[in-house]
């Protein structure tokens, strides 16, 4: 296949490809870190946890589909798709984990969580093997189609959870109350972090 140079151009700026990749991931993680506490507070008030998880899942799937059009000469689009896919994955995972107390008693949390992760890893390995087989046996031109497969696989296997997980939407509070609840959760996280210097140093090191 085509060999991509180590240096790529992104919005007119030349960067090492791995450097750009790290920057995009770090920015997407930062967005998730800021949004998650706010959205979890909004979800608690509105009862729309499942709806928010669907939005993130759809965004992540669309990001994967967008990587089909990955083009080294147009890194802006390619990195935008990666950015969206990463936000979709980590954003939906937060709501996914929040459902555990609603679907199982406390003494079954560990078992159910381990089972869920095991099934997820099995599914991802099966898809990985399929994608590798397409690339190695059919040809490298199938590489873009593997991103399409990932997007479809992700969204398709999310449907059983979307149908079965409890959803208890309530009448939406005023916009002001929703925003206030979101910032309240964000302040709570900030206060919690202020007492954990090691974690703060780790986060600074991660993003820098």
Walk through the language-model features, giving the residues of each.
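Hydrophobic core of transmembrane alpha-helices in multi-pass small-molecule transporters
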Residues: 57, 63, 74-92
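Juxtamembrane intracellular "pre-TM" segments in multi-pass secondary transporters
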Residues: 166-204
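Glycine-rich segments within core transmembrane alpha-helices of 12-TM secondary carriers
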Residues: 111-134
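Central cavity-lining transmembrane alpha-helices of secondary-active solute carriers
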Residues: 18-41
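C-terminal membrane-cytosol helix-exit motif in multi-pass small-molecule transporters
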Residues: 127-136, 152-170
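C-terminal ends and interior cores of transmembrane alpha-helices
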Residues: 33, 54-73
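Cytoplasmic membrane-interface "Motif A"-like loop-to-helix N-cap segments
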Residues: 43-57
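Pair of pore-lining "gating" transmembrane helices in MFS-fold secondary transporters
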Residues: 1-6, 83, 197-208
């Amino acid at each position: 296949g085509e060999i991509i140079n180590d240096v790529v151009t992104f919005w007119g700026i030349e960067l090492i490809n791995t450097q750009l990749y790290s920057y995009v991931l770090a920015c997407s993680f930062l967005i998730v870190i800021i949004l998650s506490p706010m959205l979890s507070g909004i979800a608690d008030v509105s009862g729309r946890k499942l709806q928010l998880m669907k939005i993130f899942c759809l965004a992540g799937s669309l990001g994967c589909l967008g990587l089909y059009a990955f083009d080294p000469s147009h890194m802006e689009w390619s990195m935008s798709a990666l950015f969206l896919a990463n936000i979709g994955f980590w954003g939906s995972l937060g709501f996914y984990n929040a459902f555990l107390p609603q679907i199982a008693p406390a003494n079954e949390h560990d078992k159910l969580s381990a089972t869920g992760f095991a099934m997820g890893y099995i599914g991802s390995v099966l898809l990985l093997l399929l994608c590798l087989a397409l690339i190695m046996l059919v040809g490298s031109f199938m590489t873009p189609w593997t991103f399409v497969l990932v997007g479809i696989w992700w969204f398709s296997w999310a449907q059983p959870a979307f149908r079965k997980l409890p959803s208890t939407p309530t009448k939406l509070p005023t916009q002001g109350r929703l925003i206030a609840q979101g910032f309240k959760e964000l302040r709570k996280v900030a206060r919690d972090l202020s007492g954990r210097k090691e974690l703060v140093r780790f986060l600074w090191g991660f993003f820098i």
